[in-house]
Amino acid sequence: MRLRIAARLLALLALALVALGTAITRAQSPELPIFDTHIHYSAPDWIEYPPERILGILEKAGIRRALVSSTPDDGTLTLHAKDPKRIVPILRPYRTRGDMGHWWQDPAVLAYVQERLQKNRGVHKGIGEFHLFGGQTGTFVVKRITELAVQENIYLHAHSDELAIIELFTLEPRLRVIWAHAGMSSGPQAVGALLDRYPTLWVDLAIRNSDVAPGGTLDPGWRAVFLRHPDRFLAGTDTWMTSRWEALPGSVTEVRSYLSQLPRDVAEKIAFRNAERLFP
């Protein structure tokens, strides 16, 4: 009996030492820099958050680079002019928030996109973030957007369901797509299946912290797909409304917390290395 108790105590002690060692290793590891692939700086933000304040928030949060799209595009270009090394511009096809619900069938939006790309040639590294769902991809506007993406060698940033992602690649297999929010509600199995199917699909994890790591603990399903596709996931926060700027540091802390539960090399890829490879 005493031997059994002693053996159990030794086993518990061993587990405690492993946990302690892991905690110490995490504490001693340098803080992960972040390449945030989901930032907006739209018109409602501009008065309360001038560019210098925005850049200060990013710096304090350890966001060394950011993929930025805005409604309208002027917000993105303003930030880029202030800090071109940190800010990577992409072109959102929204002149106002009202464009969100119909941009995919509005020739005027297409004209706006073409004009901005031409006027600022080489500045925008993608088109998006845009909202597009299954059954909406069969318009001339969407077809032309996919053609522009291939022609200009730039990415699409799609806030879409799984069906729309499939439809986009069916429309133009040469696309390079960043799937915003991992589909917002798609689970790790569905995300993994699309990554298996499309080698030029990447996934940003903005707004998915509570799904990826409920209660702060990395979900086993998400962990498995991260390990299976370590080169295809991207960190993100999403400042979709003005109040999100105050929430951004906390969101970044949550991202670092669940990434710390992965092997360091995988964590670094998701935190910044994958995005740096896409946007060198």
Regions found by a protein language model. Give the residues of each.
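Mid-to-C-terminal alpha-helical segments outside catalytic/metal-binding sites
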Residues: 2-4, 8-12, 20-35, 47-69, ...
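Mid-domain alpha/beta scaffold segments of enzyme catalytic cores
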Residues: 23-134, 144, 148
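Conserved, mostly hydrophobic/aromatic
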Residues: 38, 58, 149, 181, ...
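Active-site environment of divalent metal-dependent phosphoester hydrolases
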Residues: 42-44, 73-76, 96-98, 133-136, ...
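Solvent-exposed, acidic/flexible segments
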Residues: 44-51, 69, 106, 110, ...
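A general structural detector for well-ordered alpha-helical segments in enzyme core domains, enriched
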Residues: 50-57, 75-79, 109-116, 141-145, ...
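Catalytic pocket-lining loop regions of alpha/beta-barrel enzymes
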Residues: 81, 89-91, 104, 136-235
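Active-site gating loops and adjacent loop-to-helix segments of metal-dependent hydrolytic enzymes
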Residues: 121-124, 199-202, 209, 250-256
